[in-house]
Amino acid sequence: MINEDKIKVAVIGCGFFATNHILSWKNFKDVDLVGVCDLDEERAINASHLAKGTPYFTDAELMLKEVRPDVVDIVTTAPSHYNLAKLAASLNISAIIQKPLAPSLKESTKIVDLAETTQTPMMVHENFRFQQPLRTLQKIILNGEIGQLLFCKISFRTSYDVYRQQPYL
């Protein structure tokens, strides 16, 4: 049952990373996950089961036209991002796009131009920005605890479970 007071979200791409996206969307009280889509029907069916019966599709355009989400979460490979973003924009649907935004700077620029031209909100998904270890590091840097930072390179590898009890989206 769809609640009109909630944000309607659909997911395109039901591979490895989509599992975390789907579970996260299902955890938001103000979100209705209204559809999942993958070209591979078996993946789409599995995602539907993971999402507790959310309708599944193998055709992104059909899904977007049928379920009319407010937001589409594009969790596919980078080469497909532009065409899916263009589809979302043509239907006036905001998009969250898995990083990398596109396979090249030129194609990334096309997506940015598309968003500006159509005035369709499009965002790049950054999944670890709000993880507790990175938030702690940000606080240390902002408080000047390590002095003036001139350069920083972070490799985020740890035995710490970054998924348990942490925001993913």
Region annotations inferred by a language model:
Residues 35, 70-71, 151:
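Short, Asp-centered acidic motifs that coordinate Mg2+ and/or phosphate
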Residues 80, 100, 123-130:
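Rossmann-like NAD(P)(H) cofactor-binding subdomain of soluble oxidoreductases
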Residues 128-169:
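Predominantly a Rossmann-like dinucleotide-binding segment in NAD(P)-dependent oxidoreductases
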